[in-house]
From Swiss-Prot:
GO BP annotation list: ergosterol biosynthetic process; methylation
Pathway: Steroid metabolism; ergosterol biosynthesis; ergosterol from zymosterol: step 1/5
Similarity field: Belongs to the class I-like SAM-binding methyltransferase superfamily. Erg6/SMT family.
Gene Ontology molecular function terms on file: sterol 24-C-methyltransferase activity
EC id: 2.1.1.41
Pfam families the UniProt entry points to: Methyltransf_11, Sterol_MT_C
Biased composition regions of type Polar residues, renumbered to the chain: 1-12
Protein name per its UniProtKB record: Sterol 24-C-methyltransferase
Ranges where the record places region Disordered: 1-21
């Protein structure tokens, strides 16, 4: 997608008369943004639009492996990052809400914490380290359906704008905000846009944060530069970044297989290393205040335990064992079978099972990457935009 195109204008399907004035997402989701999320939202999608979304996403992955991937294939994926990312979230947002909740990210776990409380505390921690305060104007890069934005707005009293490339997510984020009483006020709002071409004036925001979202950028330096431009001088940018760690060896076939597996079902055009991320944020003009892999700690429970199938060992409550079951290997195997049946009889759109299988492949790669210390979803960076010298 060129920077001049609207994110939802690129995809075209044959228009029926009753959908001529609708965007692709409106045709695809058919008002399901008003549902409660998860499985109920998967029902009733437009079949033709669903096939288009599946085709546009999986054309970058079908028939490709870590062994056969070429530089040309990776560059093509990077060039098509906008469609790749948008269609990925058209396909997986309902799955994420069903299996994970409204905050699409991992977290660290303190002793005795439930899954939900750990997710919230992790969001509050980032807000605290950035120094977000009441009345500040803050940008959430890659806001998803708004879970973190709502929590940070409550925690700090800041005015938060969330941006995501996916229109369906914007609609869901607005609905959840309204359900919590935010309405159309200034404290919490959501817009659709491409973070590689942010639609805001220069020096608009007092602070910016991103939680596991800028990994979708084709080049980290470029998205960090966009953030630098909209941040006020002296403002702080803090993020949790998905990266391959210093232990990753590009020449090791096993390492490359894990990286490719994470990219495949993660909607990621080009997963980078921690050192690349550090260099990128500095090249964008920021003063790096701190960087830390939060996965490299002595937490009782590793960040990947909800995916690993051993919840009985780490979960703090029986409720967490039940709520995370769908994400475990056993839960994913059941989903493979059930979705195959319901898709064959037309209850869910074409490609639903394929999408679930892709997410399962990536879950296995995430666990392997975490256990072997090759990957982290929580590389914390906190950086300041310098104040111009007089």
């Amino acid at each position: 997608m060129s920077k001049q195109q609207h994110p939802s204008s690129k995809t075209q399907i044959t228009r029926r008369r009753d959908t001529a004035d609708m965007t692709f997402e409106q045709v695809l989701h058919k008002g399901s943004s008003a549902n409660m999320g998860g499985l109920s939202s998967m029902l009733g999608k437009d079949r033709e639009a669903s096939k288009t979304a599946v085709d546009q996403y999986f054309r970058h992955w079908d028939g490709k492996t870590a062994k056969t991937e070429t530089t040309k294939v990776r560059e093509e994926r990077k060039a098509d990052y906008a469609t790749l990312t948008r269609q990925y979230y058209n396909l997986v947002t309902d799955f994420y809400e069903y299996g994970w909740g409204q905050s699409f990210h991992f977290c660290t776990f303190a002793p005795g914490e439930t899954f939900a409380s750990a997710i919230t505390r992790y969001e509050h921690t980032l807000a605290h380290r950035i120094g977000i305060k009441k009345g500040m104007k803050v940008l959430d890069i890659g806001c998803g359906v708004g879970g973190p934005a709502r929590q940070i707005a409550k925690f700090t009293g800041a005015n938060i704008t969330g941006i995501t490339i996916n229109e369906y997510q914007v609609e869901r984020a607005r609905r959840y905000a309204e359900m919590e009483g935010y309405g159309a006020g200034e404290q919490l709002k959501f817009v659709q846009g491409d973070f590689m071409a942010l639609p805001f004036e220069k020096e608009t925001f007092d602070a910016v944060y991103s939680i596991e979202a800028t990994v979708h950028a084709p080049k980290l330096e470029d998205v960090y530069k966009q953030i630098f431009n909209v941040l006020k001088p002296g403002g702080i940018f803090g993020l949790y970044e998905w990266v391959m760690t210093d232990a990753y060896d590009e020449n090791d076939p096993h390492h490359k297989e894990i990286r490719f597996g994470i990219e495949h079902g993660g909607g990621i055009a080009n997963l980078q290393t921690a050192q690349t991320a550090i260099a990128a944020i500095k090249a964008a003009g920021f003063e790096l205040l701190e960087s830390e892999d939060l996965a490299d700690n002595s937490d009782r429970a590793p960040w990947y335990w909800p995916l690993g199938g051993n919840a009985w060992q780490y979960a703090s409550t029986f409720g967490d064992i039940l709520s995370t079951f769908t994400m475990t290997p056993a839960g994913r195997a059941i989903a493979h079978t059930v979705l195959g049946v319901v898709e064959s009889i037309g209850l869910v759109p074409p490609g639903t099972k394929k999408t679930a299988d892709s997410l399962s492949t990536t879950a296995a790669a995430l666990v392997a990457g975490g256990k072997e210390g090759l990957f982290t979803p929580m590389f914390l960076m906190v950086a300041r935009k310098p104040v111009a010298k007089e």
